[in-house]
Amino acid sequence: MLAGFFKTIERYTPKLVSWNGSGFDLPVLHYRSLILGVPAPRYWDMGEEDRDFKFNNYIARYHTRHLDLMDVLAKYNGRANAPLDDLAKLCGFPGKLGMDGSKVWEAWSTGRADEVRAYCETDVVNTWLVYCRFRFLRGELDRTAYDAEIALVRDTLSASDAPHWKEYMAAWDAT
């Protein structure tokens, strides 16, 4: 899985968007790749191989190949960080459904991988929805494009039979 993540970086150079990714998710990937010996030259490039990466790479805090949305919205001030769950709900999105990050290890270690997967998937969607709102705030999306993206997410999730998406959509409809 880790090798696949970095192969995707190598092939497509996608923009990464996270919520506290600089503070948790990416360091976990860094340590795991170090321990397991998983190479990721494009990810670690800071302009040595590709000059475009000198001022926009995945590692530097103020660059945008990796956008830690929590960090940006807090103006890079740790005292101003807000929880994704709270912000998603304040924006009219469902937020987290029962599990939070502090319960992931317990669920995983007791064989409840499906719960962990569902938690991670809903976390990704909450992050995406807040990111879409951020792009609207910045003028990257106009109202029509923003509304279309939110409608696409709603339609896609509504078409799923997975229990966590049914619960998520019920929570969204209740907001």
Identify the residue ranges that each predicted region occupies.
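Metal-dependent phosphoesterase core characteristic of DEDDh/y 3'-5' exonuclease domains
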Residues: 9, 13-118, 122-144, 155-156, ...
